[in-house]
Amino acid sequence: MKLQQKLAILADAAKYDASCASSGSTNKSSKNGKGVGSTSSGMGICHSYTPDGRCISLLKVLFTNFCIYECSYCINRASSPVERARFTVEEVVNLTIDFYKRNYIEGLFLSSGIIQSSDYTMEQLVSVARELRKTHDFRGYIHLKTIPDASPELLRMAGLYADRLSINVELPSKQSLALYAPEKNPATIKKSMIVLRDHIDESKESRKKSKKIISSSSGSVQKNKQSSKFIYSPAGQSTQMIIGADQSSDAKILTLSNNLYSKYNMRRVYYSAFSPIPHSAEQLPAQSPPLIREHRLYQADWLLRFYGFDVNEITASSTAVNDSGPAGMLDLDVDPKLAWALRNRHFFPVNINTATREILLRVPGIGAIGANKIIKSRRFKQLRVMDVAKCGLSIKKIEPFIEAVDANPACRLLEDENLKQYFIKKESAQMTLF
């Protein structure tokens, strides 16, 4: 099989991994000799974000879509009638270097089906990363999907060459995993996550000690100490969870995510809406969950990580606000923070001149940057309602929930039982503009 055929198959097979997003652009060919900038030959290119916030292009492929596992929800499971392909280590390395030199990509995202054994598959992935780093002195970004059943030594080696590692938790519950992916063991997955976490923590401590030594040492000692640093997966570890394949509630999903963040020091939990596949198990749903559910989970995840919200606060059911759907599910009509505000109207209005940053972050429409701007602005004067707009914030969403030095008639909306409809209509009207 030609290399381009392999790339087409294995790039397409990698699209189900949510750990980095595709560019969404339409490829434009330059085969007729006209135009510049074509990446039509660079299939498998996706966008992702580095820890410092930069958006980069990655070559996103599977090493192989052959697999010995029979995961019901996976298009690449052993019994799936899909076209199969497999790269060699050299082919992935050469593709990465070639695309990098053409300025198509800035890094590699590499995953794989399981072939022969977990250790054998992991050895192939590690070999790709090692070859790139050692032989070609590749200094771009590398994200490796690690195999949970692989030996601790291979997991350790992977982190020496990769910027980020990830192990998929797959499904929100043990029961679902046993039903749909019987070869995968939740205990083994968590054990491997602990191995990665411990190495990452060790690396952080090593870098801290190295910085202290360097700052108090002479130049000759500094060089030796720098080379002795233990650097392991500097961008941390992440995981992915399929939603909508089972009956797990959003509360259960977010509780698991919160546990992954606190116990395993996850840098990111990705949510991937289940996509029905041909010849799948009868127990699996025939339709995908609404895409907005995936979006709401990401919003709720953000509230957990950066806004000081608790899972119970985000997912608490209230018939007065969300009288449709089962308990423990996020409101699909409005974002999670607005849903919380509508359930807790006694918390409002918040005085923007006296509220702490933590309280400001609870106001719908005020994010971390907006809260900082408000706090900075009120050092110089008492803020009026319209001063919030001068901070670059949408006053229409915020004004029912705040009070300022001047009168704010919009606060009366808090007493309106149909306040939720006010926001739904406003969002719908805005969407019709595009």
Protein language model features and the residues they cover:
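Flexible, acidic/Gly-rich N-terminal and inter-domain linker regions that tether
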Residues: 1-66, 403, 410-425, 431-434
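Conserved AdoMet/S-adenosylmethionine-binding subsite of the radical SAM
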Residues: 93, 116-307, 314
